[in-house]
């Protein structure tokens, strides 16, 4: 347990240096955060409190100044005199009538101590007589009832709550200091013992219920010790818990859960800060006994091994001399007599003689002490110890520690519909952890469910669990404690375990940029306390370029000017450059920050330094870098301009060649065609195109769908459909030519879009309602007499125009009209084609007859 105390001692000395690889030789994050103006790091103390089991709430965890005080006094003389000068009425008014939301322990207890400070003026006769009566009235009528209400309000009645038990421990420390003002007891240990006795007398029924009614560690330790013996274990406690047994702890009594099992053992509860003595009967008796049981209306007689019986009672181990012990008991007796309260106590000088006669008999009562000062303990009927849920609780914690602070959840519970509660209760009673729900249910009986976190579908405990772990669980090995703590802080426990172990090479590295401030403090404590023999630089690495630059700048700046750059706003010396840092971090949104980056952002937000600068290892390099960047920008701009000039030079000869050849670009020619077309012609085109599509659809309905069609069928069908084109020919040759020109321009789109459009039309429309453009009605009867004009239209280069692509009516025309001879398929009048497939493309005869292709396209364009 020395490592635990070293951690607590290391809290007060967080300063120092940490060597984080080569980038932070003297970089101190904690020191830098403390110096930042207006920055407050909240809740840094929970990891520190949880780091120690023995001293988290221990009454011995007082400051060194209090240890150096004179014996018999709890505080300095000036403080007592200043408090003693207060009006007693003001002290009474300071005590609230109702229970406050926050516990004013320092105000209430120290106010009580100030009132009792008048006891310094008591004469020896008053101390020898009943002079403590009025002070006992103040103690029991004003102070302790209020504190009892506070303890009760904080959940002390709940057996699973440890908050109130910690309050009792804190009260005993404060009350011990207050009693030291006038008790005239020579040592602080005597004053603490007197305070605990008084608190047990006043708060015992509320804060310290009988042992069998609460889930204490001693019961779990008993079950843990005898779990492999295959014997029933019975436990019992005495009825009156306000009877004080004081025994001389000379180290001869073994510790339960740590040492070998003996008839008399002791157990120290880290939560209650109280010691329990355990008397074990039938330990060496391996005989059997007949047991009658009822099953299905029948009485069965079975033989079982004689159960082990454990009788428990609280006691106070002391190492003082007999005179000091009797002086303390006498003081408590006279103080309680002032309020007409009797106390029963006994001092056992020789602890080896405890229970000698009791273990050899079947009596359920035990008499301790010598006449006339004797105490009789009457024990209850022994009950089955396995009914205590604490046994499962400590087994759970043992598994937790053995697996590095985590528990592998088993298969999911087979919860029956409508019986989830019964299934969970069954799992808890059997100690089976199959789901997060059963784990929470089991843990909630011993500690708050808020202490359970779920990280990556695995349960992890918060640091407050460290105050719940007794000594018999970790048995002095602190490594599982640190691993549990690391897991509760969501650290990589594998890396921490390798770092804490003295064997092996370098551990797995952790990126320092991903650490939170609490995680950094915890690792720093382990390093400063000497628990981690390997340096912190072996564990932490800096992989972010910004963090490396940041640390290098801070180390350089502090080494050059002796101050961190975060406090430059308070420096008036002109020789120190007033350069702001961390300004770049202000551009990062708060929702995307994490870990140390968030803390740095807080530093930036709270600082008065608003200018932007570059974080470099040397301040003089700023101007050089700006000049270099300006030069690079100029070169990039010049290169872009030269690239534009080259592109213009490449385009000029192309236009010149086109002018010499007498050709025009497709866009230019298309614009000319649009300008030549009258408006009425456009209307005629629309109406004609609509009529044409309608008539073709009507003809299409009459056409039977076959998988293959020969040339004769195509000609016959085309002959029937020939009448559908006669209204279009009646409009005149000029209009027909213009319609063909405009429609042909809309057909030259990219090949990919054509195929997609054709497939969509084929799938969306029923096969009987396909447009006639999808059918190969190719015949020379529909070819216009003016073949030369048709040849010009087909020979035009392909142009994709936005206007034609948006036209919904023209999109119903055939989409595969390329004249490049590829194997993708052409609309020819030769060979067979598949109508049922929906494509209407021919792949076997593609590109065979060039003249037929042109004629087919002319047909479709008409």
From Swiss-Prot:
Organism of this sequence: Ictalurid herpesvirus 1 (strain Auburn) (IcHV-1)
GO molecular function, one term: RNA binding
InterPro entries, per database record: EJC-associated_protein (IPR052793)
Basic residues composition-biased segments: 751-760
GO cellular component: ASAP complex
UniProt-annotated stretches for the region Disordered: 45-91, 633-824, 837-862
Start-end of Basic and acidic residues biased regions: 633-650, 657-686, 694-703, 761-779
Protein name: Uncharacterized protein ORF1
GO biological process, alphabetically ordered: RNA splicing
Ranges of biased composition (kind: Acidic residues): 57-69, 78-91
